[in-house]
């Protein structure tokens, strides 16, 4: 009986240790005061990538561009860069959550969004939000799972 418990505990410890070693943290280069932000752009655990919330900021001003369409493009480019930095593609994205300060921008966002996928789209939510960081209109986060070769 004690041997079974000991073996069970040993297997549990080994599986936890193996899982911890299987993480890759994705942090894209950041400028200015963005360098010290306390989060990763994505975390790859096994074949699953957890994509942190991305906002679309102009690299020169650190603020969202005047155009909602341009901001949507910057957000989606940030998502794409994180996904590709982990060795995955946008076709591996299985779930997306979009937070938006103006639900009237639904069609504007969709016009940009759909250009990033080929074929089937990820599961998705488009959620209204009162305010977002740095005055952004959109924040996007998601999950990608690497397909078997």
Predicted feature locations:
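N-terminal secretory signal peptides that target proteins for export/translocation
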Residues: 1-2
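N-terminal presequence-like segments and the immediate start of the first folded domain
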Residues: 5-10, 18-77, 81-94, 99-149
């Amino acid at each position: 009986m004690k041997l079974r418990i000991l073996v069970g505990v040993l297997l549990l410890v080994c599986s936890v240790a193996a899982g911890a070693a299987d993480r890759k943290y994705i942090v894209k280069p950041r400028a200015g005061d963005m360098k010290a932000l306390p989060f990763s752009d994505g975390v790859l655990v096994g074949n699953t990538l957890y994509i942190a919330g991305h906002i679309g900021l102009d690299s020169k001003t650190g603020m969202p561009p005047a155009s909602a369409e341009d901001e949507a493009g910057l957000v989606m480019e940030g998502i794409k860069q994180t996904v590709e930095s982990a060795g995955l593609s946008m076709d591996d994205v299985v779930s997306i959550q979009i937070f938006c300060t103006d639900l009237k921008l639904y069609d504007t966002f969709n016009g940009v969004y759909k250009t990033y996928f080929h074929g089937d789209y990820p599961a998705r939510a488009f959620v209204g939000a009162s305010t977002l960081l740095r005055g952004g209109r959109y924040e996007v986060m998601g999950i990608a799972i690497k397909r078997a070769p």
